[in-house]
Amino acid sequence: MSRRHAAEKREITPDAKFHDYVVAKFMNCLMLDGKKSAAEAIVYGALDKIQAKTGQDPLKVFHEALDNVKPALEVRSRRVGGATYQVPVEVRSDRRQALAIRWLIDYSRKRSETTMIDRLSGELLDAANNRGAAVKKREDTHRMAEANKAFSHYRW
């Protein structure tokens, strides 16, 4: 990692259908091997499926799912005098969003439905209703931070 200057953030363009930056970021994270059109088809297909199932605005459900998965605290390893402590720290807002997106994608890929559209829509619906593997991951992260609260004075 270079110590000269931090890498500058790239501007991302909002997605074509919803004109939403977060949906565009989600697509970029879902994309494999530069196949953006495939990622778009999966995300839009999943959001259409959510609308068909619930009758609600799919963008609202998507943002609700993302908010339910965003972690507030996480633990970072800190070495103090030969011992390594798991120190709970607050998560920055940009990292919070990145972790939520990553967890939603990872756990939707691990689901058992046949198509990625079904898996992603299922995980988004579960997350919007505060259940599912991605929400469990957030709860586990918070539980780890709570268990190591005694070491919070080692914060940096």
UniProtKB/Swiss-Prot annotation:
The keyword Ion transport does not apply. Keywords: Ribonucleoprotein, Ribosomal protein, RNA-binding, rRNA-binding, tRNA-binding. InterPro entries: Ribosomal_uS7, Ribosomal_uS7_bac/org-type, Ribosomal_uS7_CS, Ribosomal_uS7_dom, Ribosomal_uS7_dom_sf. It holds the Pfam family Ribosomal_S7. GO terms for cellular component: small ribosomal subunit. Part of the 30S ribosomal subunit. Contacts proteins S9 and S11. HAMAP family: Ribosomal_uS7_B. This is Small ribosomal subunit protein uS7. It comes from Paramagnetospirillum magneticum (strain ATCC 700264 / AMB-1) (Magnetospirillum magneticum). The gene is rpsG.
